[in-house]
Regions:
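Export/targeting segments at the very N-terminus of extracytoplasmic proteins
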Residues: 7-65, 153-156
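Flexible domain-boundary/linker segments
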Residues: 56, 60, 76-77, 125, ...
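Soluble periplasmic/extracytoplasmic beta-strand elements of cell-envelope proteins
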Residues: 56-58, 83-85, 129-131
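A generic structural motif
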Residues: 46, 90-92, 134-136
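Peptidoglycan-targeting cell-wall enzymes and recognition modules
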Residues: 14-27, 38, 64-123
Length: 156
């Protein structure tokens, strides 16, 4: 039986609606783990809570598998780059900015803050409102892994 440490965020706060649908999980390498930690650090720096970090990490898992992607040539979705696959042509920032994990996370969170009631929405709806993806339901599959990462790294 796992022992829950008092200083770890509670799962009911991280996943207030329960996970939506089937969950995916990938093994993370050191770079991907560092990017998850960078998202958490940027979330804390903006004064947002653990749920915001879960939404952010789940979004980055869907968009880039937590890899800070540069331009992929023919495989690129328009001019999308970075952890959140943000587009310079859509006003997210310069290529240099959106491939900086702190900047990209802060930009995503700025968008999330503008979504009325995001804290009470299912993760996939909150993420989709910011990202405007062609696949709006795909964010939900990463909620458990994102919550696990926040639990593991929020206080580290």
């Amino acid at each position: 039986m796992a022992v829950v440490q008092a200083d770890k965020p509670a799962m009911d706060k991280l996943i207030p609606h329960g996970v939506q649908g089937d969950q995916s999980r990938i093994d993370l390498d050191d770079e991907q783990t560092a990017n998850a930690k960078a998202i958490i650090a940027a979330t804390k720096k903006t004064g947002m809570d653990e749920r915001a970090a879960v939404v952010s990490i789940a979004t980055a898992l869907q968009e880039s598998k937590l890899e800070n992607l540069g331009h992929l040539g023919d495989r690129n979705d328009h001019d999308s780059q970075g952890l959140f696959q943000q587009r310079p042509s859509s006003g997210w920032g310069t290529v240099e900015q959106i491939t900086d994990p702190e900047y990209a996370t802060t930009a995503f969170l700025k968008g999330l803050k503008q979504v009325d009631g995001w804290q009470d929405m299912p993760l996939t709806k909150a993420a989709q409102t910011v990202q405007v993806s062609a696949y709006p339901d795909h964010y939900a599959q990463w909620e458990q892994q994102a919550a696990d990462l926040v639990t593991q790294h929020w206080n580290s």
